[in-house]
């Protein structure tokens, strides 16, 4: 019997889960700081809901539940649209959600079949203020995780829509062209050109598209190039650039950025950190999606890829810095007869907010220390005959090797001072 998890999915040992929970905790605290509220939706949705606007490629990646009309969610945006349509939340509705999604695609670096997304969305705000706040919040999250140079790229689907219209690319081909262009960084220009050719886009039109996408210069110059052909998209771009400057966020206009999902209708954006792992965050405006679920409204969101961030954090991490446990103190009884004393001490420490463990197996002191060391617990509070009589503990720091007899209250102060 093979006990490995399914292809493209992983188990996480305690030390890895601690890292993940710490990362998610940082992200969640910043989401809340910006006023986003939690919203929970099921992991399973009806296929009718999931297929509304996902496109053929994503539709083929949905994990379907046999003999039912249900499937696992492939992102957090479609469930949001359904939930908002079923509710009457005050506007603007600012929501966050952090949880797993599933896509049946070929696993590779930074891309799994089960992965955690951390999403924030704003429903009911049509202006660029929502986009600016989302991007600023995401950038703050990434900086708080120790990445001080996030690369933010923005574009606007209205610009590309206008370009396609000027080139007389049929409406029914637009989404296929978007999906091909979205693969530019992954498969390169030549392969994208082949895909566009296969979709029936004539070579002169392909050349015109790439002439625009490969435009050089500062942000103002790039926007100026499309101002005549796409005035609305260009105006939104200038407004967003101005707002992001007020947030202190540096951005790059990238006319090649399209994002592959079919539901985007306006600004789109990505955040990259290098490391050969693609974008760590991305999103955009999807004003038409909610109307498909019966409640027309404006909406925009951004998603942080926790798996990709964790992979980059793993690369950054120095040897020996891995935190294996939340436990701060191992309360060790010299003999089994002192277990009750150890239990009382542990409860006292816990009441002070200090995470503790006691021995549940009746092991001798040496084996208790071996367990504490291997678990990465930094402190031991030892209780025996002397400690019981003096109402104290022997506090040992496993890192420094220092050991002293102290009162419980002094032990609390020493441990908290090192937190």
What kind of feature is each model-predicted range?
Residues 1-17, 66:
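Auxiliary tRNA-acceptor-end handling modules of aminoacyl-tRNA synthetases
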Residues 16-34, 45-46, 75-89, 95-147, ...:
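Positively charged, Gly/Ser-enriched RNA/tRNA-binding surfaces
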Residues 39, 43-70:
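Polyanion/phosphate-binding surface patch
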Residues 58-67, 169-189, 273:
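Acidic, His- and aromatic-enriched active-site or binding-groove loops in soluble protein domains
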Residues 114-118, 154-162:
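Short, conserved phosphate-binding/catalytic loop or strand-edge motifs used
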Residues 149-158, 177-178, 252-258:
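Short, surface-exposed recognition loops or helix-turn segments adjacent to catalytic cores
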Residues 165-170, 203:
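Phosphate-rich ligand and nucleic-acid binding surfaces
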């Amino acid at each position: 019997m093979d006990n490995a998890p399914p292809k493209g999915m992983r188990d996480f040992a305690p030390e890895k889960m601690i890292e993940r929970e710490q990362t998610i905790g940082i992200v969640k605290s910043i989401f809340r700081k910006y006023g986003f509220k939690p919203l929970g939706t099921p992991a399973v949705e009806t296929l009718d809901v999931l297929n509304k606007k996902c496109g053929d490629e994503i539709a083929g990646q949905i994990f379907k539940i046999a003999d039912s009309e249900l499937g696992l969610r492939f992102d957090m945006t479609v469930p949001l649209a359904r939930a908002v349509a079923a509710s009457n939340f005050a506007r603007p509705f600012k929501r966050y959600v952090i949880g797993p999604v599933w896509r049946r695609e070929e696993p590779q670096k930074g891309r799994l079949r089960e992965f955690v997304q951390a999403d924030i969305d704003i429903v009911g705000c049509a202006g660029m203020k929502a986009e600016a706040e989302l991007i600023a919040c995401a950038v703050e999250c990434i900086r708080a995780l120790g990445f001080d140079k996030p690369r933010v790229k923005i574009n606007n689907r209205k610009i590309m829509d206008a370009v396609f219209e000027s080139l007389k690319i049929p409406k029914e081909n637009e989404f296929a062209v978007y999906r091909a262009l979205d693969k530019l960084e992954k498969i390169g220009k030549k392969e994208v050109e082949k895909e566009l050719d296969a979709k029936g886009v004539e070579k002169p039109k392909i050349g015109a598209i790439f002439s625009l996408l490969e435009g050089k210069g500062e942000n103002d110059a790039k926007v100026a190039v499309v101002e005549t052909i796409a005035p609305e998209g260009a105006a939104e771009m200038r407004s967003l650039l101005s707002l992001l400057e007020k947030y202190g966020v540096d951005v790059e206009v990238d006319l090649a950025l399209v994002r592959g999902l079919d539901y985007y209708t306006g600004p789109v954006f990505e955040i990259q950190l290098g490391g050969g792992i693609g974008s760590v965050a991305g999103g955009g405006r999807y004003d038409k999606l909610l109307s498909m679920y019966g409640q027309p409204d404006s909406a925009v969101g951004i998603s942080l890829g926790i798996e990709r961030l964790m992979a980059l954090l793993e690369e950054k991490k120095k040897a020996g810095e891995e935190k294996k446990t939340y436990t701060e103190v191992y309360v060790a009884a010299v003999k089994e007869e002192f277990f009750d004393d150890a239990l009382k001490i542990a409860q006292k420490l816990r009441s002070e907010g200090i995470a503790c463990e006691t021995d549940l197996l009746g092991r001798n002191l040496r084996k208790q220390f071996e367990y504490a060391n291997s678990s990465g617990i930094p402190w031991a509070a030892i209780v025996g005959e002397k400690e019981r009589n003096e109402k104290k503990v022997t506090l040992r720091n496993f890192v420094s090797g220092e050991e002293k007899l102290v009162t419980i209250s002094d032990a609390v102060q020493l441990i908290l001072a090192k937190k």
